[in-house]
Design a protein with these regions (language model features):
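Non-catalytic, conformational "gating/processing" segments within enzyme and secreted inhibitor domains
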Residues: 56, 92-271, 287-369
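C-terminal tail/sorting-segment detector
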Residues: 406-408, 441-454
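Residue-level detector of functionally pivotal "anchor" positions at catalytic/ligand-binding pockets or at interdomain
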Residues: 404-431
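Extended hydrophobic
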Residues: 199, 251-268, 369-403
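Positively charged n-region of N-terminal signal peptides that target proteins for export
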Residues: 1-4, 454
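Flexible propeptides and autoinhibitory/regulatory segments associated with cysteine proteases
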Residues: 16-85, 95, 178, 367-370, ...
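Sec-dependent N-terminal signal peptides
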Residues: 4-13
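A glycine-anchored, Pro-Gly-centered beta-turn/N-cap motif
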Residues: 202, 436-440
Length: 454
């Protein structure tokens, strides 16, 4: 089997629950285990769909971003809809503790890195940012309790605007672009009279290798894709004592970011047709040894992906939300989920990594069409990115091809993620600036509202 790289960004969650009472420790443990199962299940289902596609492509997803987006939806669900969402998340029926768990998880994820600026420098400090938001059409009345819970537990800003206007979608896209530092410029959601609400999560990660590669050592070498094509791509050269392991079907190597060893990225090179799953990941994590000198050749690459999650989440148990959902915790009326999708970006070079994701859930009113069929994508080269203080998978993916044009510039990473649009809202939804010509945000009744300025 040709080399296949899998991308699986992982944040380690050993710190989750450190400040919680004994009564909640079991909930924390149950949610952490559920998250790990959810992460690999959603990835493996994508992998299956991708392998069936006519033209296999790279798969890069963030289970962490999807977890938060679906978690916000779960908060507004009741009865059997709540249970079907919990099933997809590997949580018990009627479970209501997810918001509290995610609140603590967000605190742990956003805690400052232990960083000695005098010794290591401010510029090399890893950056992990996440943001949530809730957007509702201006004619619908959302329940205050739901808005307040999202604000407190998910740090989600709330804004009402006319979702049938292109200007409204532009405002939401600007929020996403800002939170992902320009790496995801648009959610590609069309304005619609039927669209009532959008739940959005944005995730951004940027870090430098603890021991980087020299551009002078990078050479053009062949990369063999899953479709048996051969592409000449820039191969970076690492020669260090690295964490290395050999497990069933894979050779694995782990590279650390920064000097505090909180974040890491693991690459899995297949040696046969063994499927990459949670068991393989866990075996490698337990088997790593740094006693070996490892000479690693790794391609420099950039890849972007957009995936519809509807079919995958239906297979995982969330079929009811796409037909006739009970979302009465969010608002009154006949509601259903029309779209759940994720966009992602990944760039890897001699200095380090930039990874970002945005997940969006679109909620509409009316009767859902009886049948919709969806198609996703595919296949070669495995990896993981970890925050080893929280134990959570942030990104899962599968690199099958390298865009030769996108990786010719050895300084491409420095040009990514440093531009951002003007901030629109802070984490609690307060207005930061106007939205540009013809648009502004006003406060009415304690809530933000988008208005056209003539």
């Amino acid at each position: 089997m040709k080399p296949v790289l899998l991308f699986l960004s992982l944040i380690s969650a050993s710190a989750i629950g450190a400040n919680l009472s004994d009564d909640t420790e079991k909930t924390v443990a149950d949610c952490s285990a559920a998250y790990q199962q959810f992460s690999f299940d959603i990835y493996q289902r994508f992998e299956k769909h991708s392998s069936e596609a006519d033209e296999p492509t790279n798969v890069v997803i963030s289970p962490l971003s999807a977890w938060f987006a679906v978690g916000m939806l779960q908060q507004g669900a009741n009865s059997t809809t709540l249970n079907c969402i919990n099933k997809a998340l590997y949580l018990p029926d009627d479970f209501r503790g997810l918001a509290d768990y995610n609140s603590q998880l967000i605190d742990d994820l956003l805690k400052p890195c232990e960083w000695n600026e005098n010794e290591w420098g401010e510029g090399e400090k890893p950056v992990l940012e996440l943001a949530n938001s809730f957007w509702a059409d201006d004619f619908i009345t959302c329940h205050d309790k739901y808005i307040d819970t999202l604000g407190i537990c998910y740090r989600a800003g709330f804004c009402q605007l006319d979702l049938a206007l292109p200007e409204s979608m532009a405002a939401i896209d600007a929020w996403v672009k800002d939170k992902t530092h320009g790496t995801i410029p648009s959610l590609n959601i069309q304005p619609s009279e039927e669209l009532l609400m959008l739940l959005v999560n944005a995730l951004y990660f940027k870090a430098s290798w603890q021991d980087g590669a020299s551009i002078e050592d990078t050479k053009e070498m062949p990369f063999y894709t899953s479709s048996d094509d051969v592409k000449n791509v820039p191969m970076m050269y690492f020669d260090y004592h690295l964490d290395y392991a050999e497990v069933e079907g894979f050779k694995a190597v782990r590279l650390w970011f920064g000097h505090d060893r909180r974040f890491s990225m693991t690459f899995f090179a297949p040696t046969d047709d063994t499927a990459f799953d949670n068991a393989i990941y866990t075996q490698a994590k337990q088997a790593f040894s740094s006693e070996y000198r490892v000479i690693l050749r790794l391609p420099r690459f950039t890849t972007d992906a957009e995936f519809l999650l509807n079919e995958t989440l239906q297979e995982m148990g969330m079929d009811e939300v796409f037909v006739s959902a009970d979302l009465s915790g969010m608002a009154d009326g006949s509601l259903f989920v029309s779209t759940i999708k994720q966009l992602s970006h990944l760039a890897v070079d001699e200095k380090g990594v930039v990874a970002s994701a945005a997940s969006v859930i679109a909620i509409e009113t009316g009767i859902h069409p009886e049948e919709i069929k969806y198609l996703t994508i595919d296949h070669p080269f495995y990896f993981t990115i970890e925050d080893n203080s929280c134990d959570k998978v942030m990104f899962i993916g599968h690199i099958n091809t390298i865009d030769e044009e996108s990786v010719k510039d050895p300084n491409s990473l420095n040009k990514i993620g440093n531009t951002s649009s003007d901030a629109i809202y802070d984490m609690m939804g307060h207005r930061q600036s106007s939205l540009g010509k013809g648009l502004n945000i006003v406060q009415q009744g304690g809530k933000s509202r988008l208005v056209l300025v003539k």
